[in-house]
Amino acid sequence: MSAVESGSKVLRMKESDAQKLLAMRCHIGTRNQSSAMKKYIYGRTAEGSHIIDVHMMWEKLILAARVIAAVENPKDVCVCSSRLYGTRAIYKFSQHVGTSFHGGRFIPGTFTNQIQKKFVQPRVLVVTDPRTDHQAIREASLVNIPVIALCDTDAPLEYVDIAIPCNNRGIKSIGMMYWLLAREVLRLRGTIVRSVPWEEKVDLFFYRDPNEAAEEKAAAAAAAPAAEAEEGFGWVERNDDNAWEA
C-alpha cells in the first residue's frame, strides 16, 4: 500500500482526477524506458508505447505538492521549462502558486554565478523534462537544491530527488500535470477548499502557437463584417403579389 493510500483519505486520487489524467494521455509514455523508470511502468500499448502507473503518478504528484507547499516563501521555488510546450504551463503555475519561473533556454550560471544579473538561489527546483532541463538540474546539484521533475519513461533520474512519472512531451499532458500540481499546492496551503471544484480552466495551461493564435484572430476579424452584413440583409414584402424588394 502506498503512503498516500495508507495516509489521509483526503489525499487519495478521486475518480474524476484519474479520468482527467487518462483523457489528457498523461499515462502514455515513450517506446523507450530507462532502468530508473522501470518501476513506474504498468505495461505497454499495442503500438509499443509504455503505460505509466497512474496511482504512482498521483502519489509522486502529491509528494511534490507537499514539498512546494512547505516552502515558506513561494518565490524560493523556481520552475523551469526549456521545452517550448511547457512555457505556458509554468507561467500559469507560477501565477497561481507565486513561484519564480524560467521559460526557454536556461542561462548557464543562473544558480552558480553570483556576478550574473539573473543569479538566483532557490530552495526547490521544478523542471518539465530532465533531458531538456539538464543544465538547470546540474547546477542545482552543485549548490544542493532539491529537484522535482516531470519524468517520461526514458528519463534519466540523476540528481532528481522527486520524479513525477508522466507524459512530459504532450501539450495537454504537461498542462494537466501543472494544473493538478498547482491545485494541490493551493489546497494544502488552504487557499482553496477541496469541497469546491477549482474554477481555473485547465485549457489555460495549454501551450498555443502564437502564429496559430494570430491567424485565428485575423480570421475572426475578417469574418465579423461578413456576418454583420448578412444579419442586416433581409427581404420586405411589397403590396403587389409578385414583387419583392431588398
UniProtKB/Swiss-Prot annotation:
It comes from the Eukaryota. InterPro entries: Ribosomal_uS2 (IPR001865), Ribosomal_uS2_CS (IPR018130), Ribosomal_uS2_euk (IPR027498), Ribosomal_uS2_euk/arc (IPR005707), Ribosomal_uS2_flav_dom_sf (IPR023591). CDD domains: RPS2. It is found in: Cytoplasm. Required for the assembly and/or stability of the 40S ribosomal subunit. Required for the processing of the 20S rRNA-precursor to mature 18S rRNA in a late step of the maturation of 40S ribosomal subunits. Keywords: Cytoplasm, Ribonucleoprotein, Ribosomal protein. One of its GO terms (cellular component) is cytosolic small ribosomal subunit. This is Small ribosomal subunit protein uS2. The lineage of its organism: Eukaryota, Discoba, Euglenozoa, Kinetoplastea, Metakinetoplastina. Belongs to the universal ribosomal protein uS2 family. NCBIfam families: uS2_euk_arch (TIGR01012). GO terms for biological process: cytoplasmic translation; ribosomal small subunit assembly.
